[in-house]
Regions:
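Alpha-helical transmembrane bundles and membrane-interface segments of multipass inner-membrane proteins
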Residues: 1-179
């Protein structure tokens, strides 16, 4: 697929190829390589925490699974941002070539993350009488994301809703160990 190409699976589900240089929803606060290094540090910290939790044996399986799914999703996004730009040429107006002779479109740690899942659940137009947005297109659930993003978001939601106490216990223990 070329950049911004899409395939309609259903009216409410599309495969839509974009490259995201930032964080969730394309937010870009820092350079890509700084973001990638930050992701690597966070994933390392989460991995150490999972190891400690399993070693202690005091937490429920669902809690460990949720942390592991966050780790897996974040690792997937890191792999994408570290290697995608090195292994592929740009996708503007063409299908990206794998291992191009001239090299990829980005240097190591400066690649983008491929997002492709789009769920435009409601597509309509704002009524013309509506101030500011009148007559403009309205799409409910506009974000485009990937499986790794889903893994991170769903697992974070599960942790906050069902394992909040366990999460705070780990953070408090980590803070106590630092002092």
């Amino acid at each position: 697929m070329r950049l911004y190409d899409s395939i309609d699976i259903f009216s409410w589900f599309k495969i839509y190829f974009i490259e995201n240089a930032g964080m969730a929803f394309g937010i870009k606060l820092v350079d890509t390589y700084i973001l990638t290094i930050f992701r690597i540090l966070v994933v390392s910290w989460v991995g150490v925490q999972i190891f400690k939790i399993i070693k202690r044996g005091t937490f429920k399986f669902g809690f460990i699974l949720s942390l592991s799914m966050i780790l897996a999703g974040a690792t997937g996004n890191i792999i994408d941002s570290v290697f995608y730009g090195v292994l592929f040429e740009h996708s503007y107006g063409q299908v990206a070539k794998f291992l191009p002779e001239a090299g990829g479109y980005a240097t190591f740690l400066n690649g983008k993350v491929v997002d492709m899942l789009s769920f435009p659940l409601i597509v309509t137009t704002w009524p013309s009488w509506m101030p500011i947005w009148g007559g403009q297109d309205f799409i409910f659930f506009r974000p485009i994301f990937n499986v790794a993003d889903s893994s991170i978001c769903v697992s974070a939601f599960v942790l906050i809703i069902f394992y909040r106490k366990s999460l705070f216990e780990i953070l408090a223990k980590e803070k106590k160990d630092d002092v």
